[in-house]
A protein has these predicted regions:
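Residues lining hydrophobic/aromatic ligand-binding pockets adjacent to catalytic sites
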Residues: 1-244
């Protein structure tokens, strides 16, 4: 009897990620939260910022991080700057811009609990939120594994391959863009099948916009569609009032 395929997806532990991120969780047997790679010394990335609809426009919402260190550090060592009132600021922005969304009363208390997680660790904060959101939209959060807990080293493609092998994966679910012939050959040489995600962003009803804005945090879909229909959107299913 042939061995069953074990699909692995790998991504940094993002801050309230977009729908495509959760589609990867839905399609993978193991979803590895890559907290063992470097956080940029300057600026930010999807680990501490994401876009919400604010004043009818896609705007960055950011969790500030401590910048007192003098070297590049892995995400797992990055601390949130809890000396600033960023939690209050984000919640006020949500109240102001999503207060009239159809599912605001259901989602806001849930979101408040996630944002008010008192941890200093950006990894702990994001991993907890990703797991809670996965549960809320009926995804299996037990498939989430932190990369830093695995015996896997290397850089770039080599690190990805070693992480896939560390959990016994036989296939790697990657984003829609091609990784390049030479990189693909590395996976093939290790007997790992490449699967391209090709997630088609759904168009769902949004509050206070004339034209749909894609690529926002899952929070936008939750506020406008609720837990159940957001789960359907993640799975690629249609919901009332939405179109692909």
């Amino acid at each position: 009897m042939p061995e069953s395929k074990k699909v692995v997806a790998i991504h940094q532990p993002n801050f309230f990620p977009w729908l495509g991120y959760f589609n990867k969780i839905a399609r993978a047997d193991f979803f590895l939260l890559m907290d063992n790679v470097q956080f940029p010394k300057k600026g930010g990335n999807w680990s501490n910022r994401v876009r919400f609809l604010i004043n009818r426009q896609p705007m960055w919402v950011t969790m500030p991080v401590v910048r007192s260190y003098h070297s590049v550090r892995p995400i797992k060592e990055i601390q949130l700057d809890n000396n600033t009132p960023w939690r209050t600021k984000i919640l006020r922005a949500v109240q102001t811009n999503y207060g009239r969304a159809p599912f605001y009363e259901q989602i806001f208390p849930f979101l408040t609990d996630l944002i008010n997680n008192p941890t200093d660790s950006i990894t702990d904060h994001n991993c907890f939120a990703i797991a809670a959101m996965s549960d809320a939209v009926k995804l299996d959060a037990s498939r989430l594994i932190r990369g830093s807990t695995l015996d896997a080293e290397g850089h770039s493609t080599d690190l990805l391959i070693n992480m896939v092998k560390a959990v016994g994966g036989t296939a790697y679910l990657c984003g829609g863009g091609a990784s390049g012939y030479q990189e693909d050959e590395k996976f093939a040489a290790e007997g790992i099948e490449l699967i391209y995600q090709n997630f088609q962003h759904p168009v769902y009803p949004q509050t206070n916009v004339d034209e749909f804005v894609p690529g926002l945090s899952i929070v936008d879909a939750l506020m406008n569609c609720g837990f159940e229909d957001t789960g359907r959107l993640i799975a690629g299913e249609s919901i009332e009032g939405a179109h692909g």
